[in-house]
């Protein structure tokens, strides 16, 4: 009986503590560039609707608590290991979390990660309108569809050793074709704990945006 009472007391204490610290926003003070407004953004995150561990509303709330102004949910199109348990389309995470984001005054960017072998690797399509249209086996057709939706295309973790064993980021002919068409807009320099210094030269030489994201899957 004493053990049970102690367990209940500890559980209640932990619950009380978690409630006391949740819902708090940790502001990041980053000055504006003259003539612009600086926003803190994460353009690469995952939820349970691909290979992430959090429900979409939790991911959005987490971003707000971390002090971000905008977040993109970019679940994989081709890799959905929880699909046997979650019967939904590729817009589900956006649909579920939009109301929560609006309530937090957080900009929620509609996105998806087009997930292919290297090359071309993994690319985020940001600011899309319908992820369900990005299911063509032809990679270039998927990118074209995203671009027609107004997408910003980002080349993700180009030096990720699971796809690039030597860890050296490269622009392959298919990437150069995207650049020539104006269909590639940025490359990740930072991805979670990794950074790829050569990306700075790639972006400078091809007039692409230098990106940094969490690629968060857990918490």
What is the predicted role of each segment?
Residues 7-18:
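Bacterial N-terminal signal peptides
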Residues 120-123, 163-179, 199-201:
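Distinct, well-ordered alpha-helical segments
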Residues 1-5:
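Positively charged n-region of N-terminal signal peptides that target proteins for export
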Residues 153, 162:
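Divalent-metal (Mg2+/Mn2+/Ca2+)-assisted nucleotide/phosphate chemistry catalytic cores
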Residues 158-160:
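Extracellular glycoside hydrolase catalytic/binding regions
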Residues 12, 30-32, 176:
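Residues embedded in well-ordered secondary-structure elements
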Residues 26-150, 156, 182, 189-218:
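A metal-dependent hydrolase metal-coordination microenvironment
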Residues 20-23:
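Boundary at the C-terminal end of the N-terminal hydrophobic targeting segment
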